Amino acid sequence: MTLIDEASTPQREATPAAHAVDLCKTYGTGDATVHALAGIDVTFERARFTAVMGPSGSGKSTLMHCMAGLDRPTSGKTYVGDLEVGNLDDKELTQMRRDRIGFVFQSFNLVPTLTAGENITLPADLAGREVDREWFDYLVKQLGIDDRLTHRPTELSGGQQQRCVCARALINHPDLVFADEPTGNLDSNSTAEMLGFLRRSVDDFDQSIVMVTHDHQGAAYADRVVFLADGKVVDELVAPTADSVLERVRTMGT
């Protein structure tokens, strides 16, 4: 399928890209017990951009890690599509993350000995999969790093490194992208460029994205914002604006 074909494909019905049922995650024992997730039920729709917000310690990153198979929940179930993550062994989890999920983290996690281009194609290389060169060319051009592909991470700015991470997350056409504070180390211009690209990947290619963020302006790029507090989903907002997100955050704090 070409980029033109893919872009013109009618948007699929918004069935879940991922969902959790009564998800709990507990750390410690006795008086030191911390309930990071306390019975969360949440659905992330396919071909939608969802932001997850909440105060520090509310369970945002823990939720993402459990749903992506990076951490095991104490109880409850998580699904990526119709695949129950809890039923997978370590090898199957690795394969699922490699084949079906893309990750964008605040820390870039680029391999220092590889060039930017080699870092981007790493997921396909590890999977033994031929790189979709048309998709690769599209990604690096859209992200403005097509002239930096032979440079190593230390030769790139923070914004350029994060664009490489974004391209790497999308190179295998994942079912779902999890982004944990992806703009935390970026300046305002790089932040706007990154969020604009994520928004376009949803609008143009039906990509499904879940982004953890503290930034009310960044959350306004999403279709929906889910708010967490004390390990629970406490509110949500559809078609957010920066002002409506900020007002909701202020209300939660009272």
Where are the model-predicted features located?
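Pre-NBD coupling/linker segments of ABC/ABC-like ATPases
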Residues: 2-13
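C-terminal end-of-chain micro-motif
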Residues: 3, 166, 253-254
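Polar/charged alpha-helical tracts
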Residues: 5-6, 65, 132, 243, ...
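A general boundary/transition motif marking the beginning of the first structured unit of a protein
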Residues: 10-12, 217, 237
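ABC family nucleotide-binding domain
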Residues: 16-222, 228
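Conserved beta-strand-loop-alpha-helix hinge in the C-terminal portion
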Residues: 232-254
